[in-house]
Amino acid sequence: MASSTPKTLMDFFQPAKRLKASPSSSSFPAVSVAGGSRDLGSVANSPPRVTVTTSVADDSSGLTPEQIARAEFNKFVAKSKRNLAVCSERVTKAKSEGNCYVPLSELLVEESWLKALPGEFHKPYAKSLSDFLEREIITDSKSPLIYPPQHLIFNALNTTPFDRVKTVIIGQDPYHGPGQAMGLSFSVPEGEKLPSSLLNIFKELHKDVGCSIPRHGNLQKWAVQGVLLLNAVLTVRSKQPNSHAKKGWEQFTDAVIQSISQQKEGVVFLLWGRYAQEKSKLIDATKHHILTAAHPSGLSANRGFFDCRHFSRANQLLEEMGIPPIDWQL
């Protein structure tokens, strides 16, 4: 691995150039997404590569659709970086004051989710969950035995604002090995070995939409585009899968799913495996799209995950609703 400081997304893109508006256009032309490039940076990978069907610029902004898409992507990258910085600063400040634990209510900083989940942290179950995590973290204060790190517990929500959500992929609980969990379902930081489930996801992506299989498993590029990568349980004890199940996390993430179902329309839910599919009862199928398949794990991928074509189908559904598709290429 190179020793130089890795570049972030912002290093690769210059400010969008102003173009002269066309008097004959009153709306944006259609765009389609294809391909992409990879870069870990500190938050996400490169923005979607957009193929514009016409070069006509918008009258009001003077920007091409490609420039608009790039600027919007970069805006949300910057926002997710700010949210991450706030969480990191709060954890660092608490440790400097001799506290190992930061209350959960201080780690969800994305305002759109706080508005979508009013009062959730004041409910009795949330207090019990917070007390449980405090005991776990204080007990293990001398070693990082709870994953992901505290500042990444709500990474999925802090990276994908509520009003940005257009696709949801539900996992079960975080990876329980050192350095793997980063608060996004199925995702691992760059440099970590690809788990079998994630490798199978990439294989299906390659077969379905032609994406090349990346060398890393950081899915934050998807998250910034509006793919909510949500685990049902958001923390886990080291080397003990499901150790934080039935402690209150399921109630919280069920509230997240219900808020999407009730307050939004046209979201595409990808439910892989029985555990995720049980969440379908929380989703209004008359307002949203639910795609189901086997889990991508090595044990079940051959029993219905491979050839499910969920990635192309999700984009087809989004485009039919006039919503920009996901650039799945990392």
UniProtKB/Swiss-Prot annotation:
It catalyses: Hydrolyzes single-stranded DNA or mismatched double-stranded DNA and polynucleotides, releasing free uracil. It is found in: Mitochondrion. Gene3D superfamilies: Uracil-DNA glycosylase-like domain. Disruption phenotype: No visible phenotype under standard growth conditions. Increased resistance to 5-fluorouracil cytotoxicity. Residues 1-49 form a transit peptide. GO terms for biological process: base-excision repair. Belongs to the uracil-DNA glycosylase (UDG) superfamily. UNG family. This is Uracil-DNA glycosylase, mitochondrial. The gene is UNG.
